[in-house]
């Protein structure tokens, strides 16, 4: 079985790294929609169209299962498009909500504007723990910082402090990284939070559930190949991905095929 992962850019590599750690024998195709980065400022209709195009392309590549390594797509597109495909399609919201709700009662979520506006995390967490209080904060400057390789320094601390201030004021006990780009900023974010706050990385939660659902052979130590594709500049993506993968990936640019007429509406 080939697993498809996709994100708008580098964020999904946090999911890929977790797969390499937990499921090293799992073959993966990773697609980064870098030509349309970031997704967080897109409309729900745009995001659903992009996701349909990616899933259609994954089908053509022989992918049997897809994990949306993007919270925005998981929040806005997964409930709409998953049933349209024979692929098994999963996302990040539900696993992260389950992880947050296990112990958290005052839960902060930092995410893209589109994810926050969907209130997907609030609904998912409160469906599990109705008494939980959830505060969601949009952090639109985080993705450009990560994609630009700016992960430390006073600029990053200043931006993070501004986003986290209302959550610290609410005395949260749990923080969900509601975008796969945000764990790259964990050293700064963690330094600005009280030591008692537990951070939830959706990549860890989602891959743990994926590992439990796959046959034991996928958990062997043999390393499977990962093939990388982008809609934008492959050289730029490879250079940006190198520090996080510890190797220089071979990346191929692709043009996503047009959707079948029945899916263009």
Swiss-Prot record:
It is an enzyme of class 5 (isomerase). GO terms for biological process: cell wall organization; peptidoglycan biosynthetic process; regulation of cell shape. The keyword DNA damage does not apply. Substrate binds at residues 7-8, 39-40, 71-72, 180-181. Gene3D superfamilies: 3.40.50.1860. It catalyses: L-glutamate = D-glutamate. Belongs to the aspartate/glutamate racemases family. This is Glutamate racemase. It comes from Gloeobacter violaceus (strain ATCC 29082 / PCC 7421). The gene is murI.
């Amino acid at each position: 079985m080939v697993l498809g992962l996709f994100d708008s850019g580098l964020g999904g590599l946090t999911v890929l790294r977790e797969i390499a750690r937990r499921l090293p024998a799992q073959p993966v195709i990773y697609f980064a929609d870098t030509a349309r980065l970031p997704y967080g400022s897109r409309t729900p209709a745009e995001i659903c169209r992009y996701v349909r195009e990616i899933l259609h392309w994954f089908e053509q590549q022989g992918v049997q299962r897809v994990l949306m390594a993007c919270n925005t797509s998981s929040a806005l597109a997964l409930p709409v498009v998953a049933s349209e495909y024979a692929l098994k399609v999963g996302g990040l919201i539900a696993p992260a909500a389950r992880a947050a709700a296990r112990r958290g009662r005052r839960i902060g979520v930092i995410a893209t504007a589109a994810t926050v506006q969907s209130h997907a995390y609030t609904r998912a967490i409160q469906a599990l723990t109705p008494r939980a209080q959830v505060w969601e904060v949009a952090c639109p400057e985080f993705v450009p910082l990560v994609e630009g390789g700016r992960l430390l320094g006073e600029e990053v601390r200043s931006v993070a402090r501004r986003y986290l201030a209302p959550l610290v004021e609410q005395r949260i006990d749990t923080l969900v990284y509601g975008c796969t780009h945000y764990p790259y900023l964990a050293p700064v974010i963690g330094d600005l939070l009280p030591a008692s706050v537990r951070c939830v990385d959706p990549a860890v939660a989602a891959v743990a559930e994926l590992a439990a659902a796959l046959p034991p052979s996928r958990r062997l130590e043999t390393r499977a190949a990962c093939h990388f594709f982008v809609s934008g500049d492959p050289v730029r993506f490879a250079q940006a991905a190198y520090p996080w993968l510890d190797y220089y990936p071979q990346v191929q640019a692709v043009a996503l095929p047009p959707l079948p007429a029945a899916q263009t509406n």
